[in-house]
């Protein structure tokens, strides 16, 4: 990119605020369209000009100084509420019930079921230390659970399956 083309494109944008990429390319017919649009892109990336998308149309504006006012009022963007990551009710009675159920399952050696209940307690709680504790208990249950491997007779290999 030649500096003179960059400067010329910037001066054009300053003289014609709100111009589109097509307007800029048409104004510099002596240069290839691609080169002119690359110059406009470099100006946007370096912060020397601003742009705004209106549907499929990109409009270019001179970078505003502290003293300058916005040429036209910006439309107010719709703000979305921050996503709530807690899905449970945070009811202490429900959490206590789930905790007791998980501990009872652990005492009976049903570690996979207990891990599932610990996860339900995790979802129900909003307290971060409590949630961390539930995850730790769940991990411990998963480590203790036996990795069940099916024996050869339980497998249906190709050629051995007799359908009903």
Curated annotation (Swiss-Prot):
GN (gene name): yfdN
Organism name: Escherichia coli (strain K12)
The organism's place on the tree of life at top rank: Bacteria
Protein name (Swiss-Prot/TrEMBL): Uncharacterized protein YfdN
């Amino acid at each position: 990119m030649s500096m003179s083309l960059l400067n010329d494109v910037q001066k054009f944008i300053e003289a014609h605020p709100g111009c589109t990429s097509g307007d800029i390319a048409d104004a510099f017919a002596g240069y290839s369209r691609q080169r002119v649009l690359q110059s406009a892109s470099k100006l946007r990336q370096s912060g020397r000009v601003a742009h705004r998308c209106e549907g499929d149309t990109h409009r270019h504006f001179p970078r505003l100084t502290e003293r300058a006012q916005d040429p036209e009022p910006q439309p107010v963007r719709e703000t979305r509420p921050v996503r709530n990551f807690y899905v449970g009710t945070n009811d202490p009675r429900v959490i206590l019930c789930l905790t007791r159920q998980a501990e009872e399952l652990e005492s009976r050696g049903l570690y996979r079921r207990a891990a599932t209940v610990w996860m339900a307690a995790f979802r129900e709680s909003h307290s971060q230390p409590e949630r961390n504790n539930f995850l730790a208990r769940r991990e411990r249950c998963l480590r203790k659970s036996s990795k069940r491997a099916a024996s050869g007779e339980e497998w249906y290999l190709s050629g051995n399956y007799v359908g009903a």
